[in-house]
Curated annotation (Swiss-Prot):
Organism: Microcystis aeruginosa (strain NIES-843 / IAM M-2473)
UniProt protein name: 4-diphosphocytidyl-2-C-methyl-D-erythritol kinase
Keywords, in A-Z order: ATP-binding, Isoprene biosynthesis, Kinase, Nucleotide-binding, Transferase
Catalytic function, reaction form: 4-CDP-2-C-methyl-D-erythritol + ATP = 4-CDP-2-C-methyl-D-erythritol 2-phosphate + ADP + H(+)
Residue runs in coiled coils: none
Gene3D superfamilies in alphabetical order: 3.30.230.10, GHMP kinase, C-terminal domain
Length: 313
């Protein structure tokens, strides 16, 4: 049996709107998601055992069944028990380059890579939609991470509508190491403060999805107008996260003042990103930001936008 190493890219939210409450307790969302070429490396090796083992050098990444990548492997074993019995377990090694607990879907993209890798090792021949359906059972971002690119994501985030790929741009990612934001807290706080603005009917949800799909940001992406893209990025969760996390608010303000195309918090944070027209512009902004924000645990990453999801190396 073959071993495989896969690249699992991070994601940013170019658009995140909370539309209303769903019967299942989740929020109805309309998002535009984008993969970024800052990637973890996931290696899967058959181990000849009847178990999955997970290894990672990062101290904040659990190496047990609480890890979403391990849960992805367990899901595959439950879905395909005969193949699991025949092929046996797999050792999963995660080389972590995406910041942890950062709003960049690091856990989700690792899980997506495990699904793709086990499909290859067990020679299942699953289609991309079949992999996305399995991924949706693991988390709201995981389906998107399988395919990547530039995608309108609705429902909990698992309903995917790919659009014209956004290419040629670079992104700065910035995060304080000591900061983390609880995603459940962010959404619950938004509900408490803004529930009176929620839409309630499926018809209203559909209408709002259509409005965003034909709206200014999606048009700017289709027309490849970088300045307009930066102007129309949006994240509802900033309304609750930024007031409670002044360092994130300050980071957003500083980066936004330094001349990129657009700056915003990704997902529930605390990572802030800036879209840039080139690597050189991104490097200049990071240099200037470091001079303004002198903090030993403030980390920056620069990477191009990518139109791919999980890739085999």
């Amino acid at each position: 049996m073959h071993s495989y190493t896969l690249l699992a890219p991070a994601k940013i939210n170019l658009y995140l709107e909370i539309v209303g409450d769903r019967p299942d307790g989740f929020h109805e969302l309309v998002m535009v998601m984008q993969t970024v070429a800052l990637c973890d490396r996931i290696t899967l090796r058959p181990n000849g055992l009847q178990e999955f083992r997970l290894f990672c050098h990062h101290p904040l990444v659990p190496q047990d069944s609480s890890n979403l990548a391990h849960r992805a492997a367990t899901l595959m074993a439950k879905e395909f028990p005969r193949l699991f019995a025949n092929y046996g377990g797999i050792d999963i090694t995660i080389e972590k380059y995406i910041p942890v607990a950062a709003g960049l879907a690091g856990g989700s993209t690792n899980a997506a890579a495990v699904l793709v890798g086990i499909d290859l090792i067990w020679e299942l021949g699953l289609t991309r939609p079949e992999l996305e359906t399995l991924a949706a059972r693991l988390g709201s971002d995981t389906s998107f991470c399988v395919t990547g690119g530039t995608v309108i994501c609705t429902g909990r985030g698992e309903i995917l509508d790919p659009i014209a790929p956004l290419t040629g741009l670079w992104v700065i990612l910035a995060k304080y190491d000591h900061l983390s934001v609880s995603t459940p807290w962010a959404y619950q706080s938004y509900r408490q403060k803004f529930q009176d603005t929620y839409l309630s009917s499926p018809e209203d949800f559909h209408h709002r999805r259509q409005q965003v799909s034909s709206g200014a940001l999606v048009q700017a992406i289709a027309q490849k107008k970088p300045a307009a893209i930066g102007k129309f990025i949006h994240n509802d969760l900033e309304k609750v996260v930024l007031p409670e996390f002044p360092l994130v608010a300050e980071l957003r303000q500083v980066l936004g003042d330094l001349g990129g195309l657009g700056t915003m918090m990704s997902g529930s944070g605390p990572t802030v990103f800036t879209l840039c027209s080139s690597q050189e512009v991104a490097e200049t902004i990071v240099k200037e930001a470091r001079e303004i924000l002198v903090a030993p645990d403030l980390q920056f990453w620069i990477a191009p936008i990518t139109d791919t999801g999980i890739q085999v190396t």
